[in-house]
Amino acid sequence: MYHRNILVEQTDPEIWAAIQAENARQEHHIELIASENYASPAVMAAQGSQLTNKYAEGYPGKRYYGGCEHVDVAEQLAIDRVKQIFGADAANVQPHCGASANEAVMLAFLKPGDTIMGMSLAEGGHLTHGMPLNMSGKWFNVVSYGLDANEAIDYDAMERKAHEHMPKLIIAGASAYSLRIDFERFAKVAKDVGAIFMVDIAHYAGLVAAGVYPNPVPHADVVTSTTHKSLRGPRGGIILMKSQHEKAINSAIFPGLQGGPLMHVIAAKAVAFKEAMSPEFKAYQQQVVKNAQIVADTLTERGLRIVSGRTESHVMLVDLRAKGITGKEAEAVLGSAHMTINKNAIPNDPEKPMVTSGVRIGTPAMTTRGFRDEEARITANLIADVLENPRDAANIDAVRAKVHALTSRFPVYR
């Protein structure tokens, strides 16, 4: 028997200390990693519920275990809500993460040795889109597309490569690309060469849900995403698809890749999807994009170069070469000033992947805590202050004090 009032702080002080320390970090640091966000208390409550106890292999109404009548309700709510948000014919909410969602698509439609086409990791793509060390690069023949001289996707080159190599799967989507993607152009190319067209909107899903970024669902055979990042849910994945692909995708997830779904996480996804259907969520995403534009413009005014020249989303890459500092060093010194970013390669980066010449900055988390125009401008100036004098301890101390003053005014969890 368990007593409900016995908590982690009583049973495991070491873990409780780590949780409390991380809570303090999140409250007192400005989070600028584009793939991170803050889940709502409602999402976290669902994820910490008794649904974690239930095994439910299969799908609603077709389980391999008894006693699934209540988790069926939770999963069906998640499915119905995410279909409504994105206008999808069908949806699978069971993927444990975005990588699993992408793997399931490949399992459903490809055999080892088939050719796939995705955006080059070195120019903004994601490792699951064909990186040699990833399963996608090990099992399939990979053809990559990249950027043109203006650091925008080179659609003409992509089209030429598609006709030359005739891939079975074409992937659109990126992890470090700030501009809007022309999904309709990709779809036409995929149709012309007879390829399945998959879009990975892991980074852009929240923006798409709110209508501030193009929706690929009308154009794609399959759309994958994570449920955290800009969508602001629990860590997990989803797959949206045309109805004719539902059976193949569902079979690829279970029993193809996964066993029992995480019902507590699926319930948390459902809660996040309901939140994403609210007017407040749309206003939030509008501010995410506005904050990103303000940060990019301010950094440009301070002498930093934004890759692609601008952002049209929530994310940007900053080229640091003119400042004589690497991405690795910038990540460290900004972290010392309590601003969390990640080092990131820029196109044609001369540095090693763990060093890099750039950093990636995103605005979803800072916007969740209430930052608007003024705070976005202040944050960008604080970033620039650090990067102008990265080895000056007094400068770092002064910026850290300003960061604390700002975060104290905008707590994440009140």
From Swiss-Prot:
Its biological purpose: Catalyzes the reversible interconversion of serine and glycine with tetrahydrofolate (THF) serving as the one-carbon carrier. This reaction serves as the major source of one-carbon groups required for the biosynthesis of purines, thymidylate, methionine, and other important biomolecules. Also exhibits THF-independent aldolase activity toward beta-hydroxyamino acids, producing glycine and aldehydes, via a retro-aldol mechanism.
> What InterPro entries does the annotation carry?
PyrdxlP-dep_Trfase, PyrdxlP-dep_Trfase_major, PyrdxlP-dep_Trfase_small, Ser_HO-MeTrfase, Ser_HO-MeTrfase-like, Ser_HO-MeTrfase_PLP_BS, SHMT-like_dom
Q: Which UniProt keywords apply?
A: Amino-acid biosynthesis, Cytoplasm, One-carbon metabolism, Pyridoxal phosphate, Transferase
This entry's Enzyme Commission designation comes to: 2.1.2.1
Q: Where does (6S)-5,6,7,8-tetrahydrofolate bind?
A: 121, 125-127
User: What are the protein's GO molecular function terms?
Assistant: glycine hydroxymethyltransferase activity; pyridoxal phosphate binding
Q: What is its main location?
A: cytoplasm
Per its UniProt record, what PROSITE patterns does this chain match?
SHMT
The pathway that the record names for this protein is: One-carbon metabolism; tetrahydrofolate interconversion; Amino-acid biosynthesis; glycine biosynthesis; glycine from L-serine: step 1/1
Quaternary structure?
Answer: Homodimer.
Gene Ontology BP annotations: glycine biosynthetic process from serine; tetrahydrofolate interconversion
Family indicated by similarity:
Belongs to the SHMT family.
Record keyword Amino-acid biosynthesis present: yes
* Top EC class of this enzyme: transferase
Species in which this protein is naturally found: Variovorax paradoxus (strain S110)
Cofactor(s) needed by this chain: pyridoxal 5'-phosphate
Spell out the coiled coil positions from the record: none
**Protein name from the UniProt record:** Serine hydroxymethyltransferase
Q: Gene symbol?
A: glyA
